[in-house]
Amino acid sequence: MNCAIIGSTKIAEVHAEQLVKNGVREITFISRSEKRRKKIISKVKKKINKKVFFFHSDIKILKKNFFNIICICSNTEIHHKHLRIVSGLKSIIIIEKPIISLLKLKNRYESYLKNLYKKNKRIVVCYPYLFLAKSFKKFCRNLKKIDRIIFEFQTGGTAKFEKICINLMPHALSFFHIFFKKNFLKKNINKTNPIVKKHIWQTSFKVSEKVINLVFKENYKKKTSVKLKLNDLVLVRKTKKNRSKFINYIQNYQTNKTQNINNPMEEFYKDLFKNMNNKEYYKINKKLTLNIMKKNNFFLN
């Protein structure tokens, strides 16, 4: 099985590692910069001890060669351009969230996505926080009693102002889609005006008698972490490095105990490869994506 990865950033490295773990043995990195393509191949080779063939090229390779999987890890602002190029191909398309930039397409995003899904029925948007939510949920015995929630998400990203919301809201919405009942995204929401700063985007909203505060932060100098406060219970997801392996864990601030959890990205890829030939899997991801984009647009406007 072979794969083309569009992009040469850190997230492209992460996807490459997971693809190799699931049996991909030939990867072509696609980028305008030959220097960046060679650099990312060098980095990935150091992390992988399996026999994998690496190649690199520009975007034109997609018209010449067939790839079983095409993974889009480019800047969100140009997702729509890359999707236009690959949508008519017979490859499975994996794309980093959000599927497209709402600031770029604005009110045209719905018609764009409608036409996109007509051309390719095997598009999967990467939502690892579906699986992170399952890990957090194990700490909460009675969700009905929870009426105050704070979801604080900090990353080492570089997005600023409204772009922080576009970048991180899909994580939060997919998280609550699993954490609460699956009709969460369809419920009516009463929101407050957001507070938008250079490195912070935050808002609060009420849904089903629960008040939820969202606090998104992006700062390239900070490590990624997720803090979930449920009434008086405070849970934080962190990572630590043990030799060459990253360990994911949740810390309970009430008991000061920690519990290791599965890597959400690993869980996403296991689920993807398990359902690669399952038509219903792609339909569910499509429905989730359309609901997330609709709610994200609601919070922006």
Q: What are the residue ranges of the model-derived segments?
A:
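Rossmann-like dinucleotide-binding domain that binds NAD(P)(H)
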Residues: 154-223, 287
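N-terminal Rossmann-like dinucleotide-binding module
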Residues: 1-48
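A short helix->loop->beta-strand "cap" motif at the edges of active sites that frequently abuts
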Residues: 24, 89-91, 118-122
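A contiguous active-site-proximal alpha/beta segment in oxidoreductase catalytic domains
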Residues: 100-157
